[in-house]
Amino acid sequence: MGKIIGIDLGTTNSCVAIIEGNKPRVLENSEGDRTTPSIIAYTQDGEILVGQPAKRQSVTNPKNTLFAIKRLIGRRFQDTEVQRDVNIMPYKIISADNGDAWLDVKGQKMAPPQVSAEILKKMKKTAEDYLGEQISEAVITVPAYFNDAQRQATKDSGRIAGLEVKRIINEPTAAALAYGLDKETRGNRTIAVYDLGGGTFDISIIEIDDVDGEKTFEVLSTNGDTHLGGEDFDSLLINYLADEFKKDQRINLYNDPLAMQRLKEAAEKAKIELSASHQTDVNLPYITADNTGPKHMNIRVTRAKLESLVEDLVNRTMEPLKVALKDANLSVSNINDVILVGGQTRMPLVQKKVSEFFRKEPRRDVNPDEAVAIGAAVQGGVLSGDVKDVLLLDVTPLSLGIETMGGVMTSLIAKNTTIPTKHSQIFSTAEDNQSAVTIHVLQGERKRASDNKSLGQFNLDGIAAAMRGIPQIEVTFDIDADGILHVSAKDKNSGREQKITIKASSGLNEEEINKMVQEAEANAESDRKFEELVQIRNQADHLLHSTKKQLTEVGDNISLDDKSAIEGALKELESVIKKEDKNEIESKIQSLIKVSGKLLEASQKHQEQSKSQSSNSTSDPNGEVVDAEFEEIKNKK
């Protein structure tokens, strides 16, 4: 087997590493750098530039120089975060025919995976130049909180670049691999990996167990924000500088793409300098001009000013830390080491906040720019057999399930479940003689199905005619080692099966994901009341169905007065079943039960007489049938 390279496909910078002589090695690109800017430029003569060459010409070609593409991968054009990027990016973001966020480069529509593939090609070429052989396989990292669509899009990007992606690995987990293999400590250690990169933020709690030289890396929990990173820090500083210039010169730089591109580079440079010094000057001669002549920018920025601008962003990373610890059933005192990953963690304010939260200093012996690529190379070495005695156990970041009766999400796989994993559950039909069901797949933490992320749906038809609750539909969720979901539904009676790999058309933005978990906690009482309401509605629906059936079968065996009272109670219950008042529904249920005594007696007598015929149709061999709300698909032939 050939080399499997490890690639950190970053928002701001990318990096490639290999295993050489049982040790990971970060490779230098053709410019002699160990990291490559994740920037792609399309020149007027049709040339495609990647990395530093693309960055150097960005000032003169801002509309065709693409950066931070990772923020768009697997996302919808109408996403709030994408719309924000539409307004601030110098290049053109458009809506694809299917609603995805794409790019317009010189009139040509391009998908984010297609653009990201250019960076992967550069990483592939870097490895090939060093090794002197063709490379066709890679392990690529993604943020831990990337959803299924974003992972799929990353794999697509690898395929476009001519790489078979052997594994998608979470960035904090990769960093833990790099850290863990480099340490000679024995026994269990629990580490927190705080990963604040150019466009995304992740926190993972990972246990490293070393027994007789064999190391197991088990992810206990993960959390994060897929649209928060260094680019957001840069934007705040850019806006501050542009606003200060406008106050001083009364000129709006926002309308000048060339000026804004220069300002972006200067802001990024100033931010980096302020990690080492307490003040810096942003000097941009001839940034613009008006009828009085050329204008120059000269603004002094202090570290204190920068920290005041970005403090809210840093504070936004604190809540996921609390959730991750809670999900892992740990406290701060259980954390042995804190690892910082991502270039933005070089900011003193970030280090200070993380140190205060965990009550210990972060490790200084892990390179935040290279650790993720090294970990990816280690995983590649494990897959190829070059690295022995390493076992990696990762998790899925959000719960997965389907919509069931009453609009409830029934979870099949809970968040932070170790992957790969597989789980099956038996469901049934909601109507008599229902010939087809629709499986609606959801991702999230809320009880109400509509409050979660819809990943897609598919149909299973050809179900044999039967009373509701009799057919047995086995729904299976299977998450592979890349965290990608495969769903199947099988009619156990006929053996008919339908399966799909979920390929959601849109990514989960940070607001959606964080809201799912936070709202589930903040609105626990609301969710509990909703569950109770659904349960009472389902009870009412079952009672309506069984009472109507009994009326049809033995209604002639009771008095007209009893029959009239039952029909009246049925109408009253039907009139309130859709209301939000649980007590009113419960009251009408009791009223119907009260007037249905004679009908129940007649039905029991009828059942005793026909017991031998009805026993087959009412048996439930598994005893674990869950009513599910499936829509019937009409035959349109």
Curated annotation (Swiss-Prot):
Ranges annotated as biased composition (Low complexity): 610-619
SUPFAM superfamilies with a match to the protein in the record: Actin-like ATPase domain, Heat shock protein 70kD (HSP70), C-terminal subdomain, Heat shock protein 70kD (HSP70), peptide-binding domain
Region (Disordered): 600-637
GO molecular function: ATP binding; ATP-dependent protein folding chaperone; unfolded protein binding
Induction details: By stress conditions e.g. heat shock.
Record key words, sorted: ATP-binding, Chaperone, Nucleotide-binding, Phosphoprotein, Stress response
Domain of life: Bacteria
Gene3D superfamilies attached to this UniProt entry: 1.20.1270.10, 3.30.420.40, Actin, Chain A, domain 4, Substrate Binding Domain Of DNAk, Chain A, domain 1
Phosphoprotein found in the keyword field: yes
Modified residues (Phosphothreonine): T200
Functional note: Acts as a chaperone.
Family indicated by similarity: Belongs to the heat shock protein 70 family.
Record-given protein name: Chaperone protein DnaK
